[in-house]
Amino acid sequence: MADWSAEQYLKFEDERTRPARELLAQIPVVAPGKVADLGCGPGNSTELLVERWPDASVIGVDTSADMLRQARERLPQQKFIEANVAHWAPPPGTEVLFANAVFQWVPDHLKHLKRLITGLDEGGVLAVQMPDNVDEPSHVMMREVAFQEPWRHQLSQAAELRDLLPKPGAYYDALRPLCSRLDIWHTVYNHVLDDAAAIVEWVKGTGLRPFIDPLDLHERKAYLAAYTARVAAAYPPQSDGKVLLRFPRIFIVAIK
């Protein structure tokens, strides 16, 4: 898959940042010395961490060069490193690991969550938020269109890229033995967007990328037209012409 686009991602910055704010609000640590933002993206979540803990050493970690470029422009005083969270280990003494919308892309991510919480000192926090929307119409229709001709051959692997998230009980059973306190909850957002085209613009920044990146311009245009038509049927306009994008997310706060 091509690099993530910070510009596309930030078209809905307020909506994308809200879950990070709500995750951060549930972290009870008062004055951590070291904080890491895993999957920091363009720095919108890192900025929240810096505002909450201005005296902490906050680092951002991401695999995307374009996201890191935007993050460094946004927060030039902060440290950002290019690394895969599946292989990265926090510096000794890190007290908060903050992961907003990254681990849904990491295969076998439960294993990595266990590794990260195990590496924390007593009182350290692993805070995670992940979209839980693979079965939402917006994502089901990506796969349905991808399995049609003429895209079936090129996009069959993309259609299988993201698995359903484990059930909350699986996270509980895996993490509870490793921590003193564990909170798990779901929030379902209903984002008010202008129309079906706005939903497509939203997912072009994240979930749709594996489907459109392998296509040339002509193929991409045709795929997006077919996908947009399905989105318009699945998300009818409200009384004022707007549409509601239903968006479930799972939150996990584990305290060592």
From Swiss-Prot:
Tell me, in a sentence or two, what this protein's role is.
Catalyzes the S-adenosylmethionine monomethyl esterification of trans-aconitate.
User: Any one cellular component term from GO for this entry?
Assistant: cytoplasm
Q: Name one GO biological process term.
A: methylation
What Pfam families does this protein map onto?
Methyltransf_25 (PF13649)
Domain of life per record: Bacteria
* InterPro entries in alphabetical order: Methyltransf_25, SAM-dependent_MTases_sf, Trans-aconitate_MeTrfase, Trans_acon_MeTrfase_C
Q: Which reaction does it catalyse?
A: trans-aconitate + S-adenosyl-L-methionine = (E)-3-(methoxycarbonyl)pent-2-enedioate + S-adenosyl-L-homocysteine
Q: Does the keyword Methyltransferase apply?
A: yes
Q: To which protein family does this belong?
A: Belongs to the methyltransferase superfamily. Tam family.
Its localization reads: Cytoplasm
What EC number is given for this enzyme?
2.1.1.144
Which source organism does the UniProt entry give? Answer: Rhodopseudomonas palustris (strain HaA2)
**Cysteine disulfide partners in this protein:** none
* Protein name, entry field: Trans-aconitate 2-methyltransferase
The answer to whether UniProt assigns keyword Transferase to this entry is: yes
Q: Which GO terms describe its molecular function?
A: trans-aconitate 2-methyltransferase activity
Give UniProt keywords alphabetically. Cytoplasm, Methyltransferase, S-adenosyl-L-methionine, Transferase
